[in-house]
Amino acid sequence: MNSPARVISFVNAAHFIDHYSMLIFAAAIIVMGPALGMAYSELLPYATPGFVAFGAGSLLTGWLGDRWSRRHMMVIFFVGIGASMIAVGLVQTPLQLGAALLSIGLFASIYHPVGTAMIVSYADKLGREMGLNGVWGNLGVASSALVTGVIGQYLGWRWAFIIPGIV
């Protein structure tokens, strides 16, 4: 049930989701501005706390992963980042937007210290698995703008957050 291949597959999916979710706002902001009655330059600062949390939060989440449970931390990652993306899609005020983006950053901060440690623990061919994991993270980066743009164009910016949050 907990085979190394299965665990590594979930960790790779998490890396994809981690980077994908952090960049939805960067693409969606183009259509969000007019919908919210705000200029691009007014919306940009709302992303900053989430990106700070994405980096700085890794200190706490790595510590928790070592002292508590990496597996449970990854469950929190999947549930938390999904709920946070849905929350962004439901915001009504700029303050709510900032809080929801901060939440994405906090949950995204779990992946790198915890997921990477899991790969090290489960991989037989560490270099190969780390390389593949890097590909999955970069696929999240590469696909975020395209998928967000398509969803935002046809369904609206809110769905660009809600759909991946549900998935």
Residue spans for each PLM region:
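Conserved MFS/SLC helix-loop-helix module at the cytosolic interface between two early adjacent transmembrane helices
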Residues: 56-92
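Interfacial helix-cap and linker-helix signal at transmembrane-aqueous boundaries
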Residues: 32-33, 64-65, 150-155
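Residue-level signature of mid-helix packing/kink "hotspots" within the transmembrane helices
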Residues: 23, 50-59, 141-142
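Pair of pore-lining "gating" transmembrane helices in MFS-fold secondary transporters
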Residues: 2-27
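Cytoplasmic helix-loop-helix junction between adjacent transmembrane helices
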Residues: 100-138
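Helix-loop-helix hairpin linking two adjacent transmembrane segments in secondary transporters
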Residues: 133-167
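Paired small-residue
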Residues: 84, 95-103
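Extracellular/periplasmic helix-loop-helix junction of adjacent transmembrane segments
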Residues: 28-55
